[in-house]
Structures are given as structure tokens and as C-alpha cells.
Amino acid sequence: ILSLSLLRADDWPTYRHDSRRSGVSAGTLDFPLSESWKVEGGHPRQAWGGPAKWDAYSGNSGLQSMRNFDPCFYVTSADGLVYFGSSRDNSVHALDARTGREQWVFFTEAPVRLPPTIHEGIAFAGSDDGYLYALDARSGAWLWKDRGSPEDRRIPSNAGMISLWPVRTAPLVVGETLFFTASLTPWESSFLIAADPM
């Protein structure tokens, strides 16, 4: 379940608010808080649900989960819209911040585990299909996509197919550079991509 209260202190354009991932806003809240609207989004399909049976790289067994990064639908917000990525329906959603009504949805070929980063009218979202998508933040129209690896190889995962190099990080814009990563297993290469966001 995705439940939000309308708190219009300032925009929250990227995962955990800013490029430092501080999770802190300069805005203030007026108490008591009240629920403005809520959206039933179902439960996320986590990438690594539960403890690890064994570590294929080292051979260790009886491990606890160390990758519990997607137990809920995280949100970003900018210019009157609230955004979230969905591992349940492999998409990016944009909602009206005032009413909670869906404004647009964009589907990818695999789960979207973190919210898009909003920068100068563009929503950047990574997907387990191995691509970073650039979407018009107001309309959801596809602008471009960039594969995070040199080839498009897929493997089975959670009753679906994902890239051997999924984009499981929230994109980050620092200055005029867009950063994202593509990686999954320690025995395959990992990629850090720096790109022009425009």
C-alpha cells in the first residue's frame, strides 16, 4: 500500500531528497497531520525477499538478507506530481500531488525498484530490464533510453526475465552529469555510467 499525506514544503526530486541522499528537507510541517489521499498499490515484488539460502560466490550458507532495499514503493515529487516506480507492474507512475489521481503510467520490460529522479522536466528511471529511461515528467512520453551494459543478456528472476545488469539504483544528477549503475552479481562486470541528462 502506498499512502501519502500532502506535504508541500518543497520538491523531493530524487531518492532520499538530494544528491547526498540525506533524506532531509528544509521545509516545515504543520501539525496535526492528516491523510489527504491514498493509493492502493499492492505489495512490491522484492528483488531479494527473505534470507539468502547461500552465497554462490563464496559458498557460504545460512545468510541473512543484506539487500532489503525495495520493501515499499518510494516516492519522489516535483512540480505538483508524485512519482513512484513499481516492481509489481514493471512501471513508473505519476500522480497528481493534490488529488492522488494517476496522471500517467509508463511500462518497462521488468520491475522498477526505485522512484525516478526528476531533473529539468525529465523523469529518469532505472529498470531491471537493464535500461535507464528518460521520460517527459509531465506527460510520461518516452524521450530516450540507455542500456547500462555492453549487451542485452537476460536471466530468469522471480517468475520473469531481467537483465544480467539491472539498473537497481536511483539515477543521480550532479551538476550537468547524470549517473546510474548497472550490476547484479559479483562475478560479472559492474557498470557506472555518466551521461548528459539532456
PLM features: what roles do these ranges have?
Residues 31, 130-147, 180-181:
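A broadly tuned preference for mixed-charge, low-complexity surface segments
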Residues 135-136, 140, 190-198:
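Beta-propeller blade signature
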Residues 12-16, 63-92, 106-133, 160-193:
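Repeat-blade elements of multi-bladed beta-propeller folds
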